[in-house]
Regions:
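Two-component/phosphorelay signaling modules centered on CheY-like receiver
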Residues: 12-29
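Acidic, metal-coordinating helix/loop segments flanking the phosphotransfer/catalytic sites
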Residues: 30-49
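Receiver (REC) domain active-site loop signature in two-component systems and cognate sites
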Residues: 56
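Short, conserved "switch-loop" micro-motifs in signal-transduction and mechanochemical regulators
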Residues: 85-86
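C-terminal output helix
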Residues: 107-117
Length: 123
C-alpha cells in the first residue's frame, strides 16, 4: 500500500508539480493553505508525511507546523517545509517548532524524494 503525502501550497503550479513528482510512489492529497490542511486532518485524513509551503494566505506554513506539532493527534506526522526564503533564522524557528526538514524552492525533485523517503524510514 502506498504511503500518503499531504501537500500544502497556495500556488497551483507548485502543488501540481509536487503532486506529479510524488504521485508515482505515493498517494497524494493537496490543499491550498494551512487552514484547508488542518480541515483535512480534522476530518480524519491521516497522511504519513506533510510537505508544506511557508508563505500561504489564511494560515501560513509556520502557523500550520506549530498547530500540527502541538496537537497530540498529529504531532507524529513528519513535516517538510518548502520555501523560496533562504534565511537561517527562519529555518531554525521552523525546526524548533517541530518541522523535520526544510528545502528551498526551486527544489531538486530527486532531493525532495530522497528526503521524504528518509523521513518515512525513520517513522
Amino acid at each position: 500500500m502506498k504511503k500518503k503525502i499531504l501537500i500544502l501550497d497556495d500556488k497551483t503550479e507548485f502543488r501540481r508539480l509536487t503532486k506529479t513528482i510524488l504521485s508515482g510512489k505515493f498517494e497524494v492529497e493537496s490543499a491550498e493553505n494551512g487552514m484547508q490542511g488542518l480541515a483535512l486532518l480534522q476530518s480524519g485524513y491521516m497522511p504519513d508525511l506533510i510537505v508544506t509551503d511557508l508563505m500561504m494566505p489564511v494560515l501560513g506554513g509556520k502557523d500550520f507546523v506549530e498547530q500540527v506539532k502541538s496537537s497530540g493527534a498529529f504531532s507524529h506526522i513528519p513535516v517538510i517545509v518548502l520555501s523560496s526564503i533562504d534565511k537561517s533564522d527562519e529555518k531554525i524557528k521552523l525546526i524548533n517548532l517541530g518541522a523535520n526538514d526544510y528545502l528551498e524552492k526551486p527544489y531538486n525533485p530527486a532531493e525532495l524524494l530522497a528526503r521524504i523517503e528518509n523521513l518515512l524510514k525513520q517513522k
